[in-house]
Every structure is written in C-alpha cells, then in structure tokens.
Swiss-Prot record:
The modification Phosphothreonine is found at T236. This is Ermin. It comes from Bos taurus (Bovine). The lineage of its organism: Eukaryota, Metazoa, Chordata, Craniata, Vertebrata. The keyword Amino-acid biosynthesis does not apply. Residues 43-65, 200-219 have a biased composition (Basic and acidic residues). GO terms for biological process: actin filament organization; morphogenesis of a branching structure; regulation of cell projection organization; regulation of cell shape. Its main location: cytoplasm. The gene is ERMN. PANTHER family: ERMIN (PTHR47137:SF1). Residues 224-237 have a biased composition (Low complexity).
Amino acid sequence: MTDVPVTFSQVECNGDTPPENGQQKITKITEGASDVDGTPPHCRVEPRLDVPTERNQEKSEKLQEDILLSSSMDEKILKEKPEEKLYVVHKALTDLSLQEAAVDKMALREGHQWEKIPLSSSNQEISRQKERISEQPLEEREDEELENTALQATEIEWLGFQKSSQVDLSHSKQDEEQEVWDEEINNDDDDDCKDDEDEVRVIEFKKKNEEDTQLKEEGDASEDSPLSSPSSQPVTPDEQPTFGKKGDFSRNAYSRYNTISYRKIRKGNTKQRIDEFESMIN
C-alpha cells in the first residue's frame, strides 16, 4: 500500500464534490500493480471544517459592506434632498428587514445561529425597559401600580368636577334666560293692557262728549218751546224735566263701569267690553 498526495481541480469521490478553491489531501490506495481483479482505485477524502465558516464570514462581511454603503448613500441623499427623508427611512427599514431575513435563511441552511441586526434604537430601548421591569422586585412594581391607580383616580375626579361645574353653569344660564323671557312676556302684557286702557278711555271720552251735546240740544229745545206756543201754560218748577238727573245717572253708570269693569279688561276681550259699555250707555 502506498499513500500518494494528489490534487484535483474537480474530482468526484463517493458522490461528493470538493470546493473549487480548496485543495484536499487525497490518499490513493492501491493493493498492488499486478492485481488480477483490476478494481478501480478507492479514494478517501479528508474534509476540511474551515470551508463553511469561511463562506459564512465572507457573506456576513458582504452584508455589512452593503449596509454601510446604503447608510452612506442615504446620508448623502438626506443632505442633498431633505424632503425625501421619509422615503429614505422607509427604504432603509425595508432593506434591513430583507437583509435580516436573508441572514436567518443562511443560518438555517448552514446550521449556525447569527446575531440579528437591530432595526432602530427605539427597539433597543423597549427591550431594555422590559429587561429592567423583569429585573425589578415585586414590591417596586406594586408601588408603581398603586401610584398609577392614584393618578388615574385624581384625573377621574378632576374630570368629574369639571363636568359638574359645566352642568351648573348651563343650568344657571337656562334660569337666567327663563327669567329674562318671563320679564319680557310680563312687559308685553303690561303694554297690551295699557294700550287697551287707552283705547277704552278714548271711546269713553267720545261717548261723554256725545252725551253732553245731546243734553245741550235738549235744553235749548225746552227753552224755545214756551216762546213758540204762547197759549201753552208755563211750566212750573215741579214739572220741569229732570235732564240733570238723567245726566247724573249716565255719569254714575260711567263711573261705576270705570271702577268695576275697566280693571277687568285684558288682552283678547277688549272688543266685548267695549260692546257692553256701549249697550249700557244706550
């Protein structure tokens, strides 16, 4: 048996292909030059463990270079065109997420676990806060919960006080508006009553003037009657007509109506009262 080191560019041994760049030590086993069976030579390949790790390192270095290039390009774009900031940020996030997914797939294929690239500082802060909360003892957590509940209770009380004050203000405004409305209605009623009273006074004054003129005409006619008929007997003072009494009666009726019915005149029945007054005088 002789061991001979041989280098192959592309050699298939037991169905496996060695890498293009790497050189492996191959031991060729021959049992003898004068072998009768003529069996082909058996190859044994010694695998190298450094090859997959070198590939993974190269891929990770390429990813880091791509990230640095994309970040530098984004900074240049932001300096040149600040209005495209949102678009660039969104694009950078999508690129990072795609690269992260590619790294995960590579790790699954190669059987190695790679560290994930953090997307932003906010995620790191959130994770740190969660770690701090988990590290805090239970007593501190309970104290913080009690403080939060107390703050919520004070906020609820303050909001309730504000609502009650607003309700009180609305009620007071409604009461004031109702009082003003009632005063306006009362003033309107008083004005209507005054107008009705003025109308009744005018009508009564006209009626009084008509009665006075009628009395004067009747007195003049009575004075002219004995002169026109000399044969007629003179009228004694006992038989004189009681025009004064009639006038007094009408005046008394007017004063009585003025004291009793005049005060009862209200809006809506003025015409009826005037008709009653005219019927009573006539």
